Amino acid sequence: MANIDPYRTEEELVEDDEEVDMSFLPPFAKGTENEVLYVENARMERRLERTERALETNMDRLHIMDEHLKNVQQELKYTQTRVEAKNKEIESEKHLNAMAEREMGRLKKDIGKMEAERQELADKINGLQNQIYKNNEKLDQFKMLMNWNQEELEQWALAERQKAEDNAALEKYRHADDGKVKELTLALERVSKQVVGRKEELEAEVVETQAAQIQLDKAAEDFRKLHVERQDLIRQWEEAVEAMRHRDAAIAAASEQFAMQKDVLRERKRELDAQARFLENETLNTKEADARVAYYEREVGKQRDVLAREQARTEELNNQVELVKATLSKAATELAQRTVENKQAREDLDAKRQKLDAARKRFVVLKRKLENEFGNLDSMEAKASELEAMRRGEEARLKAILKEHELLKKEQYKRSQVLFDLRQKERELISEISGGQGQNKNLAARIHALDEQVVARAGGVRSEEETRALNARIEKLTAILEGVKRAEDDLLAARRANTSLRADRAKLDETISTLKLENDMVSRQVKGSVEAREKALVDHDVLALEVKRLRDILAAHADEVFSLENRKQQLALSMEERKQEVEVHRDGLRAELRLLREDVHRITLELKERLLRCEKLQAKFEIISAKHRGSGEDDGEERTQAYYVIKAAQEREALQREGDDLDGRIRVAEKEVAALEATLAQLMAVNTNFAASYKKVGSKEAFEERAALRDKLDKAYDKLKARRADEAAIAGDIQVSEARLSNLGQEQRSLQALVDDMTRRKAEAQRQLDEQREKLGRALGRTDKLRQKLGLANSPQGADVELAEVRDVTRAMLLELKALALANPGAMIAEACEAAGIRLPSGGSNPPSLGGSRPGSARSQTSLGSVRSARSVASQQRGGMGGSPAVRTIQLGA
């Protein structure tokens, strides 16, 4: 008896309570213990089938849950990474806010400092304007005093000669005062130089501070760019996570659909099993089919008798009827042969059934004997080997009997199919016979009409008896003819039926063998598909791991490429900045060249003006300048040719180092690209082999899986194309950088040539300037000799003349500064003059000259001032009499 499982569900209990199909159980086994065993075996098979279905369903669910768990863990990992990125982004934003607040505080301090400086400069400007106003008033008073005629000058000179003794006494005090004034002047010059040095240091510190601020601004801008790039990366990450979530949902839906399809497949398999059972039940109708076959055989025998009688009646017919008889006899012979064959097959079937019954009876006897033997427990060990041998022999016989039983079942199924086809043919034959009878009646009527026409054509008139006799004979012959035709039609129909039955039997045999092969193939395909599915799942997991590893490698390489791109952009920005610096330096050199040319031109004009002035001084010896303080033409420090050569060499070395660095990075990037290509080629080979291994598939799940893998492969190809496009773009950028580097080298060479040309011109101008200085020194020496010879070195007339010349030189210098300020508004000349307390003239009037001298231009007055300055320097070097007034040195903006 079956064991009762307490964990079975109600549905399983209901299925177990269903009636078991007893059609396969032979009649002799009913009501015995074999029937109970058969029922228990059937129920156990049902339970096994249900358990297998439940196990397969649970395995599918377990696999789906494992996949879902992996996806959830991966999504959790991505979410944690996104949270960390968001936290870093928040920290970056806080850092940026703090930097902005610090920068705002610094700007406020700078604004306050600039406001204080502006107030201080405004106070200085007011003081300088007041001082200039007072000096202008004094200058106007002096001009009024100097507006004398020649007679007054002579009287004044006479009075001065009378007061020579008084002046001699005062001269001692003047010498002492001049010494003190010189000391104070030297101290003032030292302090001025210190102030200038402090200002230069301050400007250098300001420049360094501005450079540091620019670097900080650049760093802040780069940080902002990196912040924006990180936000873009986070956004791309979120999009990728969303795409993965959609993909996981699609995979879950596909898994559900796969489970549904498997359920449908199981349902269809269940239906096929039900159809098989129905087919087995249909075999029970074979007996009825055999009875009908016997009935049809009897009918055929009756038809033979009818045919024999009809053959006796149709002896007087033509040779065609003889031929029809021979054909009919041949068909009868074949039909008899077919009947004998069918009878022999039935006898064989009965014999096999008897053998099966005998085998089953022997099986029952042996089983009872085995049970009796099991009852004798004392002799079990002694008879174990004998019983085992008997059991093996009986199992072999049972297998043979079961195999023969299966063959008999198949044969019975074939015969039932043949019987079913014969019934179909019987219905068709009946319908054809009825149709043939109708046609025969129509033909008989037509023959009758034709006979009447023949009689009418003969023209003879028959009597009623003859007519009746002829009609009776015609009717008799017509009936005989109809019988012959019917027999012929029946014979032809029997032949056709026999031929069709043979063809149908052959088709059925072929169909049965085909169905067997298909069943075997389907079972093998199911097993193969299950194994292939398991293998595909394993390969899918391996491929997923490989894809994950390759994805990590690709992400690492993408990060490296991204860092290289950032470095490339930084290099491009630095190259642009360097290019701008070179442009600024080139503009500065051009401006310096232009200034040098202007200086050469100005020096040439000054030389001419000085020559004219020397001639004029020689002609008018009464106008002799006293002492002048020279003003150097170059206020700032000059830079020699070696400075620019060294600077250009340093820049060239820096560019060469940058080029070498770029070449090294390019080589590293090329190696990485080659490694990526090799990895990609290996991945493509693996994908190709994988696709080739799954090229021929037969199931819907395999087709769907292959389509999904093809989609993944297409996406991988798209990513590969994008990476190759990025690589091509990087190569193009590198080529552009190399082209820019070569252009910078060409510009450097052109700037070096320009610097060499400017250095050569500067040397030429310096040589000419030295020559002119020598000539000027000789002229000044001659003038000093004439002045000492005439005794005007320390006289009031000489002082007046010197004062007038100082006034003219000051006016000319102011006009020259104004012209320079108007010509170069970006040089900050006017602001520097205002800062130094010098107010430029508003009008364009020329300085007044002393009696008889023609007015000169600003350029000539400047040259005159330069000559007098040189003379003053020469007089100071010689240690001449009298002190020179202090001249304030100002620094003009570049």
From Swiss-Prot:
Effect of inactivating the gene: Short and immotile flagella. Inner dynein arm (IDA) and nexin-dynein regulatory complex (N-DRC) components are absent or severely reduced. Radial spokes are attached to doublet microtubules with an irregular periodicity of 32 nm instead of 96 nm.
UniProt-listed GO biological process terms: cilium movement; inner dynein arm assembly
Top-level taxon of the source organism: Eukaryota
GO CC list: axoneme; motile cilium
Keyword terms, alphabetized: Cell projection, Cilium, Cilium biogenesis/degradation, Coiled coil, Flagellum, Phosphoprotein
Subcellular location: Cell projection, Cilium, Flagellum
Record PTM text: Phosphorylated in flagella.
UniProt feature coiled coil, ranges: 32-143, 187-411, 461-609, 647-788
Bias kind Low complexity: ranges: 844-857
Record InterPro entries: CCDC39
Summary of the function given for this chain in its UniProt record: Required for assembly of dynein regulatory complex (DRC) and inner dynein arm complexes, which are responsible for ciliary beat regulation, by acting as a molecular ruler that determines the 96 nanometer (nm) repeat length and arrangements of components in cilia and flagella. Together with CCDC40/FAP172 forms a 96-nm-long complex in flagella.
Family that this chain belongs to: Belongs to the CCDC39 family.
Subunit structure: Interacts with CCDC40/FAP172.
Listed name of the protein: Coiled-coil domain-containing protein 39
